[in-house]
Amino acid sequence: ASTVEYDTYEQPDGYFTMQIPKGWAVQTGGDFISYIIDVYDPAQPQREIYIQLCGTGFQSAEGAALAQNYNASGETLFVMPEATTLSYFEGWYQGLGGSFQLLETLGGEADNALLYGKATLPNGTQTEGVYSAVVSSLEYNYGINLSMTMGQNVRVLTTAPGELDAWLPTLSACADSIQFSELFQNKRAENWSQVLGTSASLSASWNAMTDQMMARWEARIRQ
């Protein structure tokens, strides 16, 4: 990882730019609220930077089952019983057909934690990584529990087991380099206003997130 060369990636619609290791692939998805950036090494896909600006899950299986009846898009509906960072990732991986195991909480509160863990992907592949998300609860009960868990600024930085120490600085630097354009931020604010009746913008500081992540990780190594 110390000899990594970088390219500047420019999203074709002008939504963002970022630095990525030379030869890595970038995929994007979601709408302006849930926007996803997935950066990975085609030769070693466990090396991955996954960013999602907003993701949600239902706090009850009954709520998810009811919503599935109206889920015309065919998207996976996750069950995340608690509004915590750990519950978010446990529910996310389980919904994808895998699993998540917490190894250590590196810092933060339960709803805004920095986690060190390992995951099993649906195909059985093992990964090791650092995970963070700012999580809140959207309360809604109407006979059954339709409350939702919402994760914002979701960040997943992973490698094959045993590689994280070598690769985390590179993964963090790339995630930190993301620059969203004014065009994207304006479109996202418009979407938030339509959905929630309020305005929202990208308030997270990527620099602050990366500084915290690396400081916590280095403190763990020194122990």
Residue ranges with predicted function:
Residues D13-D31, A175-S181:
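Proline-anchored loop/turn motifs at beta-strand termini and strand-loop-strand connectors
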Residues W24, N153-G197:
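Surface-exposed amphipathic alpha-helical segments
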Residues G29-V154, T159-E163, S201-Q223:
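Conserved polar/disulfide-associated segments of primarily extracytoplasmic proteins
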